[in-house]
A protein has these predicted regions:
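Extracellular/periplasmic envelope-modification machinery, especially enzymes
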Residues: 1-168
């Protein structure tokens, strides 16, 4: 199914050389009822979940972008992902305003890294860009996003990756 035809407004939000960062997949033609949102972790969830014919999955994600409203997640020296939060905001708005979406699956590969000030990833609260407390930003963004989705009657599933096992 052609996800990009359904969401032409997603075009141009990633830099041209990195358009593969705009993850947009629809399981089959028709209205979706499950939305996967977050970053590339969804690319590993989508194939397995697509085996369930009872649902129609829609994946709207962006590279390295946490599944929260008005939050930019980038690597510290990264300039090409500056606008990816717009893709996430669009996906969340679609879920909230689309009555057919019943379940929202939120995932983020590096979620624990966002509260670690030593990590290469950083998180910016776009409503309050002067904020520097990563843990507070994470908690507020998570709470704000969940509040919006739950008020809209969505069931929310949050998926975390398996932890790294630190051995050779």
């Amino acid at each position: 199914a052609d996800c990009r035809a359904m969401f032409p407004e997603r075009e141009g939000k990633t830099v041209k050389e990195r358009d593969e960062d705009n993850f947009c997949y629809l399981q089959k033609p028709g209205s979706p009822d499950v939305l996967l949102i977050g970053d590339s972790l969804n690319l590993s969830l989508f194939p397995g979940l697509s085996h369930y014919d009872d649902y129609n999955l829609l994946l709207l994600s962006a590279s390295a972008q946490a599944p929260f409203f008005d939050v930019r997640t980038t690597e510290r020296n990264d300039s090409y992902r500056e606008r990816y939060f717009e893709l996430t905001n669009q996906a969340l708005e679609f879920a909230i305003h689309n009555a057919k979406i019943k379940v929202v699956v939120m995932s983020f590969l590096n979620g624990v890294a966002l509260t670690n000030s030593e990590h290469a990833l950083k998180m910016t609260d776009l409503r309050h860009p002067e904020r520097k407390d990563a843990r507070g930003i994470f908690i507020d963004a998570f709470r704000n996003t969940l509040d919006h989705l739950i008020r809209a009657g969505k069931s929310v599933v949050f998926v975390l990756p398996n932890p790294d096992i630190p051995y050779d």
